Every structure is written in structure tokens, then in C-alpha cells.
A protein has these predicted regions:
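ABC ATPase nucleotide-binding domain signature region
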Residues: 42-112
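Catalytic Walker B motif of ABC-type/P-loop ATPase nucleotide-binding domains
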Residues: 159-163
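Conserved ABC ATPase "signature" region
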Residues: 113-130
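Conserved ABC ATPase signature
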Residues: 134-138
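Hydrophobic anchor residue at the start of the ABC signature
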Residues: 148, 176
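Helix N-cap at the start of a conserved alpha-helix in ABC-type nucleotide-binding domains
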Residues: 170-172
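Conserved catalytic loops of ABC-family nucleotide-binding domains
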Residues: 179-194
């Protein structure tokens, strides 16, 4: 819930104070042209930009933790490997030296304590065949699946995806659309899509 929200930083304010509610069970799309304030709205909701005026409250129940950090995961999809690993860029996937130093998908995912969740996500996103692949050798579609799996393994209440369809060919977009549809049925997870027009 955000009521009368105005961020402190005067350089990144929206034209009007923000008041809106995301109700339990809702999945939301924030749609608009570039520069319309979509990312700023997300930054307000995640607490990246503290409010000067208004209030921002969360109800993450039934989560055991109450922090936005633990309960909100944000993935910005771009044609780079920035969200997967800040040290790798898309063009580096062709550099043989970088391939030697690049971690495997299994290494970046790390140890997963909840085996049932791991099995569910690995099946949903077909992760098993990727586990021994170097992260910089993943296709755009595989990278999306990896990023979603990595985020969902933390069991967030809210998953925000900024332009998840960017850079994907038509068959991969259709696959991602179907995966997102399946994600909407995962228990307490709320999905927020940020889409540029």
C-alpha cells in the first residue's frame, strides 16, 4: 500500500503523489512509454527511493520475514548478463578467455536448501540441462529461465520483472508467456510486470 507517496530526491519525482494498493492475489502490469515513470514507481515500491511524503506499508504474510529485501525480488531484463552476474556482458560470451573464468550455472545458483522447491523450479524452467553450462554461454531464453529460477529460489512474495520479453524471438516469448502463466499459480507469489510500449 502506498498513499500520497513522494520520493525525497527532487530529481526523480513523478508529477503527482502516488496512491495505490496491490491486493493479495493480484498480478499487475505497469505499462507505459519510456520515461513515463514506471521504473521510478517500482523503485518507490521496493524502497530504493525513500519517501519524503506519504506512507508505504507492506503485508508480506505469510512470510516469516517482514523486510522488502527478503520479500521483493526485482529482475531487469536487458541484452546483457548484468542481472545474472554484474561482471559479464552479452558481448563477452564470444571471448574465449572469459569463458574459461565464467562460472557454471550450478555454481551461481549455489546450494538450495528446499529440495521440493528446487525440483519444482528446475522442472518448470528445464534447468537440469543448463547446470553444467557456463553462464555466459546461455541463450537469451536460457538466461531468463536462470534469472527467474535464481530469484524464485529465495521464495519472494513479490517478483517484479522489468521488460521480460525484450530481446527474445517469438517462440521464446511464447515460452516465457506460458511460464509466467504457470508462475501465477505458485501459491502466495505476486507478479508485477513492467512493460514499455
Amino acid at each position: 500500500h502506498i498513499a500520497g507517496g513522494v520520493v525525497r530526491n527532487p530529481l526523480v519525482r513523478l508529477t503527482e503523489p502516488v496512491t495505490l494498493d496491490f491486493l493479495a492475489g493480484e498480478h499487475i502490469a505497469i505499462v507505459g512509454p519510456n520515461g513515463a515513470g514506471k521504473s521510478l514507481l517500482v523503485d518507490m515500491l521496493t524502497g530504493k527511493y525513500p519517501l519524503r511524503d506519504g506512507e508505504l506499508t507492506y503485508d508480506f504474510s505469510p512470510s516469516l520475514t517482514k523486510t522488502a529485501y527478503d520479500n521483493i525480488k526485482y529482475i531487469a531484463f536487458r541484452d546483457t548478463y548484468g542481472s545474472a552476474d554484474a561482471n559479464y556482458y552479452y558481448q563477452q560470451r564470444w571471448n574465449a578467455h572469459d569463458q574459461e573464468d565464467a562460472p557454471l550455472v550450478r555454481e551461481v545458483l549455489g546450494e538450495v536448501k528446499d529440495d521440493a522447491l528446487r525440483r519444482q523450479l528446475f522442472e518448470l524452467f528445464s534447468i537440469e540441462p543448463m547446470l553444467d553450462k557456463k553462464i555466459i554461454l546461455l541463450s537469451s531464453g536460457e538466461l531468463r529461465k536462470f534469472q527467474l529460477t535464481k530469484a524464485l529460489l529465495t521464495v519472494p512474495r513479490i517478483l517484479i520483472m522489468d521488460n521480460p520479453f525484450i530481446g527474445l524471438d517469438a517462440p521464446t516469448r511464447e515460452l516465457l508467456f506460458n511460464l509466467l502463466d504457470r508462475l501465477t499459480r505458485l501459491g502466495e507469489l505476486q507478479i508485477v510486470l513492467v512493460l514499455s510500449m
